[in-house]
Structures are given as structure tokens and as C-alpha cells.
């Protein structure tokens, strides 16, 4: 089944991401996962038994939980300390998590060890 990414929240301390996903049948879920990629809004994916096809490339994805989408739960996740990416951060903003960020691929494409200015 094909899923579309609606939104993604990232926890820099744990490296776990939370994505709101939707199917063609308008089913909506919140997926908690860890991966070598961050699912960005508008991207699509197809789940298979051992891997995930994301934008026509296979990736490993460790899924911790999938729950039915609930707006109140999503808002609670948004209130947690999170990556500046969620707040629409720009390169001129500062990233307080850079020194200990556990995210494998920065959604702002900042190389490891390079301070965010």
C-alpha cells in the first residue's frame, strides 16, 4: 500500500522521528520510527516485509509503533523539544542540538561537526 507523508517531527536526543502518514483510502496514522532517512512531507513510501520503498529507493526502517492519527496526540508530540527543522528554521538560526544530535540525516543537510549559524 502506498503512503504519503503529511508531516514529520524529529527528536534530536533519541533520533526517533514521528511521521503523520495517509493512504489513498484516507486512512491516517502516526508512525514512530528510526531510519537512515527522514521522511519529509510530500514524499511517498511503500512498506514491505523487511524494507521500505521511499521515493523509488529501498531503505531500512525500524518502526517502533504505528497508531491511528489523533490531533491531540500529534500536538503533544509537537510540544516536546525538537529539531529546528519543525519550526521552519533557517541556516541563520542556531541549532542547540548539533553537538549531541542523534539524527542520522539532518533534514537541513548540515554536515556533522559543522556548527549551525
Curated annotation (Swiss-Prot):
What GO terms fall under cellular component here?
cytoplasm
> GO annotations under biological process?
cellular response to starvation
Entry keyword Repeat: no
Q: Main location per UniProt? A: cytoplasm
- The domain of life is Bacteria
Give the UniProt subcellular location, in the record's own words: Cytoplasm
Q: Which UniProt keywords apply?
A: Cytoplasm, Stress response
Family in the record: Belongs to the IraM/RssC family.
Q: What does this protein do?
A: Involved in the stabilization of the sigma stress factor RpoS.
Q: What is this protein called?
A: Anti-adapter protein IraM
Please tell me the species this chain comes from: Klebsiella pneumoniae (strain 342)
The gene from which this protein is expressed is iraM
